[in-house]
């Protein structure tokens, strides 16, 4: 359910919102589950007013059936397609990143996941002039590379500075800080949409594995619950607030050690709507080759198995979409 904010419904003032937040009641779900008598006493609010407020919010946020035609019309008016700035990748993703969806980039160390994320951030901020939130959880984000990508797009220093201002970077090295940050972001985006100010259109999390993997396995039973809470926050951002969410994930070996698969297990596999795999191109030559094969492994629109090739060494400097030998179509 949505974040509590002034004007969400009649009677919900800014003062009431702040008092409720002081009791850690930030969402409609929090208010629905709260003991209103206790809240009224501790916040100094009217019990009857809180009951009426909860009744209105539950009616407003409860699920009502919709037919397919209405859902399709809503989809057409609420969905935007954002170019990644990489022509071959846009082709693979059926024109680009879709708002309302979580897109996952999977690859091993050095496969270019962060480079692709930086290119997406630079293109959305400069070419599309939309705001981006870049959540760095592994220390891979570098401002110098981001500036280099922007310089390849424009020589105008004012435009470069303007694009950099549209990219907000948050460093979050544990899941608890990341969850708090995403919950606060929900309220911020909702408020920005209400005031028609520039809201964040793309959220990039690089990477989810860095904060989730240490919590899984062994006797840490809360790890799976925290991972699914993170998944829920990302899905709410995407679907309810019209944001395109991009996450990166690592590769891990299968149980028999013969094959590689995305990390975080089967439960996480249902989170992204679209998943692409970055891999070093076979026969690329030297160990430091920048040629990468991009394979579509999950998509609601395209057949899986489609492949394209990108050069992470030239991202942002020129559009390259070389033919991939044996490419599936």
Swiss-Prot record:
Alphabetized UniProt keyword annotations: ATP-binding, Chromosome, DNA damage, DNA recombination, DNA repair, DNA-binding, Nucleotide-binding, Nucleus, Telomere
Pfam family, one: Rad51
CDD domains reported in the protein's UniProt record: Rad51D (cd19489)
Span list, region Interaction with RAD51C: 77-328
Tissue specificity statement from the Swiss-Prot or TrEMBL entry: Highly expressed in brain followed by testis. Also expressed in heart, liver, kidney, spleen, lung and skeletal muscle.
Domain of life of the organism encoding this protein: Eukaryota
Annotated stretches, region: preferentially binds ssDNA: 1-83
Segments for region (Interaction with XRCC2): 4-77
Positions contributing to ATP binding: 107-114
GO molecular function per UniProt: ATP binding; ATP hydrolysis activity; ATP-dependent activity, acting on DNA; ATP-dependent DNA damage sensor activity; four-way junction DNA binding; gamma-tubulin binding; single-stranded DNA binding
Disruption phenotype: Midgestation lethal.
Recorded GO CC terms: centrosome; chromosome, telomeric region; cytoplasm; nucleus; Rad51B-Rad51C-Rad51D-XRCC2 complex; replication fork
UniProt-listed GO biological process terms: chromosome organization; DNA damage response; DNA strand invasion; double-strand break repair via homologous recombination; interstrand cross-link repair; nucleotide-excision repair; regulation of cell cycle; telomere maintenance
Statement: the UniProt record of this protein carries the keyword Nuclease: no
Cellular location(s): Nucleus; Chromosome, Telomere
Membrane among keywords: no
Annotated family: Belongs to the RecA family. RAD51 subfamily.
Subunit (UniProt): Part of the BCDX2 complex consisting of RAD51B, RAD51C, RAD51D and XRCC2; the complex has a ring-like structure arranged into a flat disc around a central channel. In the absence of DNA, the BCDX2 subcomplex XRCC2:RAD51D formed a multimeric ring structure; in the presence of single-stranded DNA it formed a filamentous structure with the ssDNA. Interacts with SWSAP1 and ZSWIM7; involved in homologous recombination repair. Interacts with BLM; required for stimulation of BLM activity by the BCDX2 subcomplex XRCC2:RAD51D.
Name of the protein described by the UniProt record: DNA repair protein RAD51 homolog 4
């Amino acid at each position: 359910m949505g974040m509590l904010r002034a004007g969400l419904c009649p009677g919900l003032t800014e003062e009431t919102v702040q008092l409720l937040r002081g009791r850690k009641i930030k969402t409609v779900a929090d208010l629905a589950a709260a003991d209103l008598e206790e809240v009224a006493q501790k916040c100094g609010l009217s019990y009857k007013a809180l009951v009426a407020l909860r009744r209105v919010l539950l009616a407003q946020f409860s699920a009502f059936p919709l037919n397919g035609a209405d859902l399709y019309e809503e989809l057409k008016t609420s969905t935007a397609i954002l170019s990644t700035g990489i022509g071959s990748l846009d082709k693979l993703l059926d024109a680009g990143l879709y708002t309302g969806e979580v897109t996952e980039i999977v690859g091993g160390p050095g496969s270019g996941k962060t480079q692709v994320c930086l290119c997406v951030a630079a293109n959305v901020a400069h070419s599309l002039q939309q705001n981006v939130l870049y959540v760095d959880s592994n220390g891979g984000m570098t401002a110098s590379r981001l500036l280099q990508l922007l310089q390849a797009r424009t020589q105008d220093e004012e435009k470069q500075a303007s694009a950099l201002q549209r990219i907000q970077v948050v460093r979050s090295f544990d899941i608890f800080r990341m969850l708090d940050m995403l919950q606060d972001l929900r309220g911020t985006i909702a408020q920005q949409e209400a005031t028609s100010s520039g809201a964040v259109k793309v959220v990039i999390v690089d990477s989810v594995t860095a904060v989730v993997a240490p919590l899984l396995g062994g006797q840490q039973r809360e790890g799976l619950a925290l991972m699914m809470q993170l998944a829920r926050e990302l899905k709410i951002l995407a679907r309810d607030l019209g944001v395109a969410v991009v996450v990166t994930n690592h590769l891990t070996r299968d149980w028999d050690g013969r094959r590689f698969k995305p990390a975080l297990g089967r439960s996480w596999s249902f989170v992204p709507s679209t998943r692409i795999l970055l891999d070093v191109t076979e026969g690329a030559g030297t160990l430091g080759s920048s040629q990468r094969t991009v394979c579509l492994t999950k998509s609601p629109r395209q057949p899986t198995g489609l492949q394209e090739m990108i050069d992470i060494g030239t991202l942002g400097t020129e559009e390259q979409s070389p033919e991939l030998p044996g490419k599936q179509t």
